[in-house]
Amino acid sequence: MKLITKELEKLFEKYPIGSQDGLAGKAKVIAKFFNPTGVGTWIITEGNKLENGDYEMFGYCHLGDDEMAELGYVMLSELENLKLPFGLKVERDLYMPKDCDLIQAMKTTGITPPSYMLEDYEKEQNNDNMDYDY
């Protein structure tokens, strides 16, 4: 499976690294990559195409341990070159909702969002859903 499509290339142009700073859990998800044989999920929110054709990507990297998962950088070439059992490769999630934010992507993947990110997200969600009587 090709990890980067023309559609993803356009999204990386729209969301270069740094473009969603400060949004935390509300950052728009561009892509989700995963290890089909076990742990390893990368939920990508930003990325830059490098001169050599590789992509530097930023997002939530979860390697099977909620306590050790973190926002960070990963290179496309690193994901493409991971040696998995049975000759399998890292795959792109074809069924991730298109207009999904980071918290929604974590929840649909079964990842527990970190408390610092979830608290801010839920506060904003509650403020967005408040009924005002005038």
Predicted regions and their residues:
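N-terminal domain-onset segments
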Residues: 1-36, 133
